[in-house]
Amino acid sequence: MTSDSGYGAIVLAAGASRRMGRPKAALSYCGKSLLSHSIAHARSLSGGPVYAVVGGGYPLVRFRCASQPDRWLFNHDWPTGMASSLRAGLDAMPVMTRGVYVLLVDQPEITPGFWEAFRETVVRFAGRRPVAADLGGFAGAPAFLPRALWPELMQLSGDAGAGAVLRRRETLRVPAPGADRDVDTPADMQRLRGVRASERSKQP
């Protein structure tokens, strides 16, 4: 097993959340903001720095975040789309970083078993292979991006995420139940909280 101390993590939390009508990253779920949950998952994956890229809704997003990253990165270009946030995160990583985990804030229904399987897959291949969630047969976030991919990723623009690059590569896909259920609208958030309330009511 290779140490994961050379791997960083980026949590992308700069979006406008137009369909939600307020910053998704600041919304509360199970007593913590969605961003707090994502930062905690990032900590479980990475032995290196964890950065949160913010934009829309800042500083409220930071104020409501109980889990602090190693660095807050404000993306002044956040209105241009996700690609600028990914570029900001990659550009800020230390020069010795061999790869980064990239997480979103709107996938709280990913099942717990995914995170350990995800990390184990990255470490098994010594961080040399891109690894991503299997979203019904194609690769998507959360994802691990080896440094060799960064020059290509830095050329992305608009709302393009890493998915297009990952699909052109021999990306290892990890089953990720729940990753396809994004929280994008008030109805999604209401459903999510309803599911959680139902689970709690069944507990002894």
PLM feature segments, named:
Residues 2-139, 168-177:
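Nucleotide and nucleotide-moiety/phosphate-recognizing core
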Residues 17, 27, 150-151, 190:
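Nucleotide phosphate-binding site architecture
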Residues 28, 109, 144, 182-183:
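Short aromatic/basic micro-patch
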Residues 1-6, 151-204:
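Conserved alpha/beta core of the MobA/IspD/sugar-nucleotide pyrophosphorylase nucleotidyltransferase superfamily
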Residues 14, 22, 145, 183-184:
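Single, functionally critical "micro-switch" positions that shape active/binding sites
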Residues 139-151, 186:
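Conserved nucleotide-sugar donor-binding
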Residues 61, 114, 149, 161-162:
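Hydrophobic alpha-helical segments typical of transmembrane helices
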Residues 63, 85-86, 143, 184-188:
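Short secondary-structure transition/capping segments
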